[in-house]
Amino acid sequence: MRQTARTAAKLAAVAFMGAGAMASFSMSAHAQKTTEQGIQEYRDMLADGNPAELVELRGEDIWQKPQGPKNASLEQCDLGAGPGKLEGAVATMPRFFSDAGKVMDVETRLVHCMVTLQGRDVAEITKKPYSSAGEKPTELESLVAYVYAQSRGATIKVPQGHPEEKASRARGEKIFFYRAGPYDFSCASCHATDDQRIRLQGLPNLTKPEPAQAAFAAWPAYRVSQGAVRSMQWRMYDCFRQQRFPELKYGSQASIDLITFLGVKAEGGTMQATSLKR
């Protein structure tokens, strides 16, 4: 009888501890969900007056303005849908361009057009691609905001028909999981697990379709905390910075490959850029 009583007491204690753990987990999950909902409500309130719209208008002016030694505009720039056709184009990038002989993302393609159509110098164009706090948006930030806005609502479909496109995606996947730096981090350290966050910022699991769609569709974005439009190239650059990796060069092959990998993961999503971020 005593043995039976002791066994029953132990089982009751285990059950109580299990119930407590489940309750704690449930409360934690509820708190996280509530936090996410609060953040989303905040974004929704701000989205009605997204300052990125002003940057988009500036980008439209730059797109139409004749510049460079050739005194030409960018209106014949081909982003994959044909010269000058912008609607839905960025939802299918990065992609292979036969005239350049390589895979390009939106930003490297814009630089290519500025060089080939306008006769401008690539080093001059890319020497300062990102604005600093309190500065006006750069030419590239403005152009990016404008061209992305023309694909808002388009379905993401990053092509994989060309061997170079497949190779770019494969390299991007390797980079995503590659661990290095003083913290032995990879992109996957933050973005390959569910329900992770840093401070109030949720970290999407980019190996899953829905989170990948939401993330890819939202960039470029107006970053409220910085008062600036930040592009997808900047997003890759800043992730490398946070991992304490060597500085990611603007328009580098590694950056394009990572964006290709994420774009393929995001297939079927709906473009929302230029969106609003914290």
Where do the model's predicted regions map?
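N-terminal amphipathic/basic-hydrophobic helices that include classical n-h-c signal peptides
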Residues: M1-R2, L200
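Bacterial N-terminal signal peptides that target proteins for export
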Residues: R2-A15
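Well-ordered, non-transmembrane segments within structured domains
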Residues: R2-Q3, P163-S168, L262, A266-T270
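A residue-level detector for conformationally permissive "hinge/kink" positions
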Residues: K10-A12, H30, P51, E164
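C-terminal segment of classical bacterial N-terminal signal peptides
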Residues: M17-S28
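Short, charged low-complexity linear segments at domain edges
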Residues: D44-E60, A154-E173
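Hydrophobic, well-structured mid-protein blocks that either form specific transmembrane helices
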Residues: L143-V147, P159-Q160
